[in-house]
Amino acid sequence: MNQIKQIPVIIITGFLGSGKTTLLSSILKKKENQKTAVIINEFGEIGLDHALIEHTDENIVELQSGCICCTIQGDLKKTLIDLFDKMMTGRISSFNRILIETTGLANPVPIIHTLMSSIDLIRIYSLDGVITIVDAVNGGKTIDLQEESIKQIALAEKIILSKTDIVDKDETKSLIYRIKEINPVAQIISISFGNIKNKE
């Protein structure tokens, strides 16, 4: 029996109001991201344009861009297996990567644990990394007040610093210093108006 080529999974976490939903919405609309499945909490929060919708199937929406948007039904393991089964039986278009959006200040550890501890999921999927979006305006305050934000930063391979265009450069440098104290190896990318501006 041929071994299934594992599908990479990227977890996207982010502080509340950091621009995570805006980023995901942008990903869904771009042709170059076709064959990407995005798992979100509810369709309403992503602001899907009905003109871009090809067809729907229960908790799954297929877009003209070739992306698949799916809401979590029950638990993550069930949702991931269901997505794969529907792809294999031709009920949805094929996808070659998955992005999972976490809610607000959710701890990404349970998602990582689910992906790495379930034999059923390990056969199909591989964890390809964690991306954390940090709001440059309120990032320092969030780190001070929310323990989960520290976990999000600590586990990330990439950290996207949003709203840097409306924050003083010294404030941004100070926040980057704090982020590097928590996670010295993550790549830090600044974003302005939704575009990648520079890398630290």
Pin down the residues of each PLM region.
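C-terminal accessory "lid"/substrate-recognition subdomains
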Residues: N2-Q3, K151, L155-K158, V167-E200
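Short, ordered loop/turn segments at secondary-structure junctions
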Residues: F43, T164, F193
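Conserved N-terminal glycine/acidic-rich loop preference
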Residues: P8-S18, T22-L24, T56-D57, A156-I159, ...
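Residue-level signal for inorganic ion chemistry
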Residues: E42, E101, A156, S162, ...
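Nucleotide-state-sensitive switch-loop elements of NTP-binding domains
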Residues: N2-I11, S18, T22-T142
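Non-catalytic interfacial helical region
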Residues: P110-S117, Y125, A136-S149, I153, ...
